Amino acid sequence: MRFDEAYSGKVFIMSRSNYEKSKAVIFGMPMDWTVSFRPSSRFGPNRIREASLGLEEYSPYMDKHLEEVAYFDAGDMLLPFGNPQRSLEMIESYVDKLLADQKMPIGLGGEHLVSWPIFKAMHKIYPDMAIIHIDAHADLREEYEGEPLSHSTPIRKACSLIGPENVYSFGIRSGMREEFQYAKDSGMYMAKFEVATPLKEVLPKLAGRNVYVTIDIDVLDPAFAPGTGTAEAGGISSKELLEAIVAIAHSDVNVIGADLVEVAPAYDPSEKTPIAASKFVREMLLGWV
């Protein structure tokens, strides 16, 4: 006899045991091979799962219970340590399979570069997609110290893939001058410093569209999420990010997938970062799936 795995801390709380009957699939991407400052986000997915044990299954934000959403936690991918290219290929292939099985991908990072292969996989099925990007950093570099495969490049790659006019960034407060100039010149949407208010203004314009949402935990002020590789002072509160997640849930956009990245537990002995992240994942499941 085995005790209920859904309450073991090895999977996200209340994860179903049946992949076939699930609508969404949670999967971890434990990669921090290109991190330029502080590594450890490869340990993020499992710490988020463990922190989920402290959650209530009911959300007063969504007025829903996790028993109402069929999701399966596939665990962490076995990515080759130190090999970004092969790791990204594996992530893209896995998301291809999820989409072929008509599952909604919910990815846990890991550094933000892991979002890039997901964008590519999603674009094959949803060529008209838009991306909502919530982050402290612009991530619009073409390369970092000569390396195009970097955690500082995924949104620039997304602009090349789907067109900058289909990329909407919120909460941005850090980047090179050239990144901010690119955003201004290219036609992409960038809201600096804030998330909830500008997002609510943009969502009606995205009504009816297929939207992928990528959230970097460092959009939060370090007071709320110190456990991240590149913390940036001057961020938003946990309350504002919850408000943004709820706003997306109550909008007319069609969320086709999502990820939450850059939880680096080594820098947060209090565990407030994975605790917050687990709550965000709960709201994403209840509001977007």
From Swiss-Prot:
Its EC number is 3.5.3.11. The lineage of its organism: Bacteria, Bacillati, Bacillota, Bacilli, Bacillales. Pfam families: Arginase. PANTHER family: ARGINASE/AGMATINASE, GUANIDINO ACID HYDROLASE, MITOCHONDRIAL. GO terms for molecular function: agmatinase activity; metal ion binding. It comes from the Bacteria. InterPro entries: Agmatinase-rel, Ureohydrolase, Ureohydrolase_dom_sf, Ureohydrolase_Mn_BS. The gene is speB. GO terms for biological process: putrescine biosynthetic process from arginine, via agmatine; spermidine biosynthetic process. Mn(2+) binds at residues 112, 135, 137, 139, 216, 218. The keyword DNA damage does not apply. This is Agmatinase. Pathway: Amine and polyamine biosynthesis; putrescine biosynthesis via agmatine pathway; putrescine from agmatine: step 1/1. Its cofactor is Mn(2+). The keyword Transmembrane does not apply. Keywords: Hydrolase, Manganese, Metal-binding, Polyamine biosynthesis, Putrescine biosynthesis, Spermidine biosynthesis. Belongs to the arginase family. Agmatinase subfamily. It catalyses: agmatine + H2O = urea + putrescine. Catalyzes the formation of putrescine from agmatine.
